[in-house]
A protein has these predicted regions:
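Intrinsically disordered, low-complexity segments enriched in polar/charged small residues
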Residues: 9-10, 178
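C-terminal motif of bacterial Sec signal peptides marking the signal peptidase cleavage site
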Residues: 16-19
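Subset-of-secretome marker
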Residues: 21-359
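Bacterial N-terminal signal peptides that target proteins for export
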Residues: 1-7
Length: 359
């Protein structure tokens, strides 16, 4: 029963703190949404495993100039793209031991099998003009790779291994002195082992008998005021297959966060305007239900979120624009994850014993 309550609390936390996008739902009250989440958690069978898919795209542009005869002008462009796919599976036998309370005999190294692939790129473009002389630098960085985690035997070592490869490609083009133009590529292969036992030892050696004291206090009334104010930007919806939370994002929301958080900027730093949302956007968080009424998938979606920022200080003008698109999907999965085999270890692999590293 406790696990069901924890699942409901987790779902509610995900839904209120963080997709896919806008769906046809009927508006409901917050109390109804909480009730539906409770019911869904009670109807959810334990997930054997899950899959995760994430994509993100962030674009930032900025212009900088000096009011003193326009001696200095600069423009900046930054593009970030990221994608991730992964899956994990729980070992049913080891999970059964945990549920029965037989934690001493759990083989934690054999508890989880997982795999992950990721691809990321960053493009940085800066142009600066000083006294009509233009300099520029363009950098493209691509980072990708894959990870696998599970228990296996390799090089006469039986343990849980985190095996991965990281591929990096960097391209630089510039007319600035001292810059190394050209393309560089690098691949690294790692095999980290004794992970579960190291974590278990760390947790087991934590002294919980003496709780340290602290003089730090948190003003709960301030947090309550902020949450109460933000509540007006949050709405709930549902249909037969989904429970949805929508968070409206606009310039008034940011202004309320600043005001209720007592965030004040000193006047001596110059004439500054707070970040302003230039395009109406929203964050959609969805909890999908299976045929039994239990949770089958969670998603978070942020699309076409646009922010602008302006700043002026002693003749220096700055204007920045940022556009954000983000999607995350976590799904229940019964598909078995491929176990680690010898073929996953490259000849160039660097074996790292985590237990030795942490000594």
């Amino acid at each position: 029963m406790k696990s069901k309550k924890y699942l409901c609390l987790l779902a509610l936390s995900v839904l209120t703190l963080t997709g896919c996008g806008e769906a046809k739902v009927s508006a409901i009250e917050k109390s109804d949404a909480i009730s539906k989440l409770n019911t869904a958690s009670e109807n959810t069978e334990n997930w054997k495993g899950f899959t995760i898919k994430e994509t993100a795209k962030i674009s930032v542009s900025g212009d900088f100039s000096s009011e003193v005869n326009n001696l200095v002008t600069s423009s900046l462009k930054l593009d970030v793209n990221s994608s991730l796919k992964g899956s994990a599976e729980l070992n049913a036998d080891e999970m059964a031991k945990i549920k029965s309370g037989d934690v001493e005999n759990v083989d934690y190294a054999n508890l989880v099998t997982a795999s992950l692939t990721t691809s990321n790129s960053v493009k940085y473009d800066l142009k600066t003009t000083i006294n009509s002389n233009e300099s520029y630098v363009t950098t493209d960085v691509n980072i990708g790779g894959s990870l696998k985690y599970g228990k296996t035997t390799y090089n006469n070592i039986t343990s849980d291994f985190l095996v991965g490869n990281i591929n990096t490609k960097t391209k630089v083009k510039s007319n600035m002195q001292g810059t190394n133009n050209g393309t560089t590529e690098k691949s690294d292969f790692y095999g980290v082992y004794n992970i579960a036992s190291s974590v278990k030892n760390i947790v087991g050696n934590i002294d919980t008998s003496d709780t340290p004291s602290t003089d730090v206090t948190i003003d709960s009334s301030l947090l309550e005021k902020l949450v109460a104010k933000l509540d007006s930007y949050i709405s709930f919806g549902a249909n037969d297959n989904m429970i949805q939370v929508k968070i409206d994002v606009n310039d008034q929301l940011l202004a309320d966060i600043m005001a209720n958080g007592n965030i004040k900027l000193p006047s001596e730093i110059g004439d500054i305007t707070l970040p302003k949302v230039t395009a109406e956007s929203a964050i959609y968080i969805n909890a999908y239900l299976d045929k039994n009424g239990g949770f089958s998938k969670f998603s978070i979606d942020v699309s076409k979120l646009s922010l602008s920022f302006n700043y002026n200080l002693s003749g220096l003008n700055m204007a920045c624009q940022a556009d954000v698109n983000y999607s995350l999907i976590i799904s229940n999965s019964s598909k078995e994850v491929d176990l680690i085999t010898a073929s996953d270890f490259s000849k160039e692999v660097q074996l790292i014993d985590l237990s030795t590293l942490l000594k």
